[in-house]
UniProtKB/Swiss-Prot annotation:
It is found in: Nucleus; Chromosome; Cytoplasm. Pfam families: INTS7_C (PF22965), INTS7_HB (PF24437), INTS7_N (PF24436). One of its GO terms (cellular component) is chromosome. This is Integrator complex subunit 7. Its main location: nucleus. It comes from the Eukaryota. Residues 937-964 are annotated as: Disordered. It comes from Danio rerio. One of its GO terms (biological process) is RNA polymerase II transcription initiation surveillance. Keywords: Chromosome, Cytoplasm, Developmental protein, DNA damage, Nucleus. Belongs to the Integrator subunit 7 family. Component of the Integrator complex, composed of core subunits INTS1, INTS2, INTS3, INTS4, INTS5, INTS6, INTS7, INTS8, INTS9/RC74, INTS10, INTS11/CPSF3L, INTS12, INTS13, INTS14 and INTS15. The core complex associates with protein phosphatase 2A subunits PPP2CA and PPP2R1A, to form the Integrator-PP2A (INTAC) complex. Disruption phenotype: Fishes have a defective lens structure and abnormally shaped jaw and neurocranium.
Length: 964
């Protein structure tokens, strides 16, 4: 019964629940540990990793590991083995054990057992704990002693423990190195044992002398033991040691290339290729032109496709790095052939048409990278040959639905998209080829080709209206085929149609898609297509799809979510018909859009749940609403120039008051207010950007574009009306159009550049303020609104999930109770935190450090008898902590010299690997009550009593007594 309760706790409890639940789960598991049945004990032990995952704070983990240590000490070998597995699975939580000495003491007691299996399990347990006890001399001694054991199980466990301690302890590695060398070179050591001892040498990299001795020993082993098994283990250990010591990588590359070229055994060649690929990933900058040349010669002359594939994979890894640049940029004085005639290019060209598809895929990858790095005079011919190789591979693989063919096709299409980024003049012919091939390709290949088409068309407007007929016919054909990839193919084809239509779907396209979706598509496919329509700006069609889906969901939260999306699409559709110069229609359209947005934000709020608060979505929509309101107000302000023009004496008033803005009349004040409002909106967009740590790059770029549009409007107001002399728009530059990666971004950039040109021309020709200036402002508003808003992926889907959970100590016994502290003492506030990830941690960015900001504010006023020193009103402390295994801990010393209740806030933000700070939260608060220390209180009371006991002076005579 107790274990079922524990399982329910661990399966149903979510992040952020109360500490009581963690203690309850631990108590239930403790009951299982104390059970008389071995099965229940084992089941309780194996549930501990889930407990650590749900409640990853040191207090609970320390208690749990102490209980596991007791089971390890008192249980049988099977229970010990279960505890060992739990420890190895929970390696990232080991540093949270507070009582390390007590934990190790209980575990280490088993090392004195007469049972060699128990000793072996203990050694493996100690090896698993090496990260927290690297310098324990008793553990070092036990490992040395067990290496001389006559029991094979114990010796293997000692080797495992020795390898673990060697990787963490410099002293242990230096001390054990000679013993390991003697055992490896000893004639009485079996070959099987030598094969297990040799990999230990890869950890002897703590200093140069130790690494040099290990390398000399490995070099001797390579010469003395040329057998295949021994040579493979020795060479791989050689590579691992070089990877850690770094300075020996060039020598190791030469050694591996030597064995690849000269050793006839395929197993040795495969191992050499495997290690060369490892070194290519680790240190591509250390590969010389000669190294790559030797590898190319080996690949050209080998008769085995498997070995050629391996060598090409190494070259493929190097092709995207600086190594290729070094290959085509020899040192001064070197006489090298033209790039087109090098062995690397010959090899890549030869492999592009190889019968083995995997070899051909790597050949295409290498050739694509060469075309990007090659000198200008050679690049044209290489570009054409590369595209021809891609096209032949696409033709070959598009009709084969095997996994190998599809993987090759994906590689070829990825290379094609990359190639067309740098060579846009080749886009049209490549797109035409893909469209022709779509008719005869299999469904899995069609999905990949449609995705490639969408990626190419997003970068370049190559899908013209004449191609829509072929795409619609493909959509009709796809709906009649029943295959596993049918639904995915419908989504991919619809995406290509949206890109080709450029946010203006014709009635025929809508009718065809709608009819086919009604016939064969399931609800999820319809939702995916609607989502793509929202991303591409086809809001009219997405509104219809969301409306049809509202009644097909089983949860009211999903209903409100779809209803909000429908309202947002309706709102954006209201803005799609704007025309230049029609300002009254623009006002009406914005008003209708705001009505739909207000309905949508109400539904969006109803769709949020505690586990899915939809924070980004709500804030993004609120900003959109406020932006539309600000744009509407700006048009009204511009129109006020007609209804309330500047008075005739405006210039005189401006000269007498010294304010140049007065020459424009009342419109200047309104424009100043609008400019400040748009700058405030830009700052809010910047805050939204900084709080979206898990967002994909396209979503962040979209938020940045919205921010830049607000800055652009504020700049136009300042440049045309407020202060033309000092106005500047540094936040935007013309270089942005070169870096644009989507059609939406290209259109926004075009509008920005056009507006900036108009403003510059107008400000030079006409002095402010005139109808030309207000007309330019209104035209800017309409130009921005005419571009359909793109709802990017993060609005619908979170691919990366990162959250931080904080724990503060001391903590109050009850939530509303303040922590008492005397005013002459300082409070030590300990802040602990864990970083929790979703299924794809670090997909877009990784956390390098956590920034903790602690501040305190006085909540209640102190008594009138106490003076408040100004410097002691608040605590403001900031500290950066680098997390280790997703855990961090630090302490703050806070001063509360002022009596009263203080509110202490701890806010966390993260710094990614690029050094950018993100305001992710959370923000925890705790109340602290500053009390007067007893000694000062006693002195104050004594002083008050003395003042009360002093006799009062005689009262003065009143006026009546004076005249008596």
């Amino acid at each position: 019964m107790s274990l079922s309760a524990a399982r329910s706790f661990l399966s149903e409890a979510a992040y952020g629940e109360q500490e009581l639940d963690a203690n309850s789960a631990l108590m239930e598991l403790d009951k299982g540990l104390r059970s008389c049945k071995l099965g229940e004990q084992c089941e309780a032990v194996v549930l501990f990793p889930k407990l650590f995952q749900k409640y990853p704070f040191p207090i609970l983990i320390n208690s749990a590991f102490l209980k596991l240590a007791d089971i390890f000490r008192l249980g049988n070998n099977f229970l010990r083995l279960c505890v060992l597995k739990v420890t190895q699975l929970s390696e990232k939580h080991l540093e949270k054990i507070l009582n390390v000495d007590e934990f190790v003491k209980r575990v280490f007691s088993v090392i004195h057992s007469n049972d060699p299996v128990a000793r072996a399990i203990t050694l493996r347990m100690l090896g698993s704990l090496a990260s927290i006890i690297p310098e324990r001399k008793n553990a070092h001694h036990s490992i040395r002693q067990s290496l001389d054991s006559h029991d094979n199980v114990e010796v293997e466990a000692a080797i495992f423990a020795a390898a673990s301690f060697s990787s963490h302890s410099k002293d242990f590695a230096a001390g054990i190195c000679n013993k390991i060398s003697e055992m490896i070179q000893g004639l009485d050591t079996p070959v099987e044992l030598k094969l297990k001892l040799i990999p230990m040498l890869q950890h002897m990299h703590h200093d140069a002398s130790l690494a040099s001795c290990s390398r000399e020993l490995l070099q001797e082993l390579v010469s003395s033991y040329p057998s295949t098994s021994m040579l493979i283990v020795t060479l791989h250990t050689f590579t691992q040691l070089a990877t850690s010591s770094l300075v020996d990588i060039p020598e190791q590359i030469c050694l591996l290339l030597q064995y690849l070229k000269e050793d006839p055994r395929k197993a040795v060649k495969r191992l050499s290729i495997q290690d060369l690929k490892l070194l290519a990933k680790k240190a591509p900058h250390l590969w010389t032109r000669k190294n790559i040349q030797v590898l190319c010669e080996c690949a050209l002359h080998t008769p085995y496709n498997s070995l050629k594939l391996g060598m090409l994979s190494v070259l493929s890894t190097l092709s995207g790095t600086i190594a290729i640049k070094q290959y085509f940029s020899p040192n001064a004085g070197d006489s090298s052939p033209a790039p087109h005639h090098t062995d690397l290019v010959k090899l890549a060209q030869e492999c592009c048409y190889h019968s083995d598809l995997a070899v051909a895929a790597h050949g295409i990858t290498v050739l694509t990278s060469i075309a990007a790095f090659c000198p200008e005079k050679e690049v044209i011919q290489l570009e054409q040959e590369t595209v021809m190789g891609m096209e032949s591979l696409i033709l070959l693989c598009s009709q084969d639905d095997s996994k190998t063919a599809q993987a090759t096709l994906k590689t070829a299409l990825t290379s094609l998209v990359q190639m067309l980024k740098t060579c846009p003049h080749l886009s049209q012919s490549s797109v035409e080829l893909l469209l022709r091939q779509l008719h005869c390709a299999c469904d899995p290949a069609r999905v990949l080709m449609c995705q490639a088409l969408a990626a190419i068309a997003t970068q370049q407007p190559v899908l013209v209206e004449g191609m829509l007929g072929d795409l619609l016919e493909l959509f009709r054909v796809a709906s009649h085929r029943t295959s596993e990839k049918q639904q995915e193919l419908l989504v991919s084809l619809a995406t290509v149609l949206f890109v080709a239509s450029q946010a203006s779907l014709s009635a025929e396209v809508k009718a065809v898609i709608r009819q086919q979706l009604e016939n064969v598509a399931n609800g999820w496919t319809v939702y995916q297509i609607a989502r793509q329509a929202s991303r591409m700006g086809c809001h009219d069609f997405s509104r219809e799809l969301y409306q049809s889906l509202r009644t097909r969901v089983a949860s009211e939260h999903f209903y409100f979510w779809l209803n909000s999306l429908m309202e947002f699409s309706q709102a954006e559709q209201c803005l799609s018909g704007l025309e230049d110069g029609d300002y009254s229609a623009a006002m009406s359209a914005i008003s209708e859009a705001l009505k739909s947005y207000q309905k949508g934000i109400a539904s969006l709020t109803a769709a949020s749940t505690p586990l899915s608060p939809l924070t980004f979505q709500c804030e993004f929509v609120k900003l959109r609403i406020d932006t539309l309101q600000a744009l509407s107000q700006l048009i009204c302000t511009c129109n006020s120039l007609k209804t309330s023009p500047p008075p005739a004496i405006a210039t005189t008033i401006a000269l007498s008051s010294g304010s140049d803005l007065q020459r424009c009349g009342r419109i200047s004040t309104q424009m100043k207010f609008s400019m400040d409002e748009f700058r405030s909106l830009a700052a809010r967009y910047a805050d939204l950007y900084q709080s979206s740590f898990d967002a994909d790059y396209a979503t962040l770029r979209n938020v940045e574009l919205q921010q830049q549009s607000c800055l652009l409007v504020s700049y136009v107001i300042e440049a045309l009306i407020i202060d033309p002399q000092t106005a500047s728009f540094q936040e935007f530059g013309t270089h942005g159009s070169i870096l644009a990666e989507s059609e939406y971004e290209l259109r926004m950039m075009a509008v920005f550049n056009h507006v900036l040109e108009e403003v510059e021309n107008l400000s030079r020709k006409h002095p402010p303020v005139s109808y030309l200036h207000t007309g330019c402002l209104c035209d800017t508003v309409i130009a921005i609104l005419k571009i359909p808003l793109s709802f990017q992926r993060y609005f619908f889907q979170k691919l990366q999930s990162t959250s931080i959970k904080l724990a503060l100590s001391p903590s109050p016994r009850t939530p509303n109770e303040p922590i008492p502290v005397q005013n002459n003492q300082q409070l030590t506030l300990k802040v602990e935190g864990v970083i929790q990830h979703g299924s794809s941690p670090g997909l877009f960015r990784k956390i390098q450090a956590v920034c903790l900001k602690v501040s305190s504010t006085l909540q209640t006023k102190p008594g009138s008898d106490f003076k408040i020193p100004l410097e002691s009103k608040t605590n403001e402390i900031e500290q950066k902590v680098e997390p280790h295994n997703d855990y961090f801990s630090t302490q703050f010393l806070l001063n509360f010299s002022i009596l009263g209740t203080h509110q202490v806030s701890v806010e966390a933000s993260v710094v990614d690997t690029s050094g950018i700070e993100w305001k992710t939260g959370p923000k925890n608060t705790v109340s602290v009550k500053s009390l007067e220390d007893p000694y000062s209180q006693q002195l104050r009371h004594q002083l008050q009593q003395q003042q009360q006991n002093v006799p009062q002076p005689a009262a003065q005579r009143n006026i009546s007594t004076r005249f008596q």
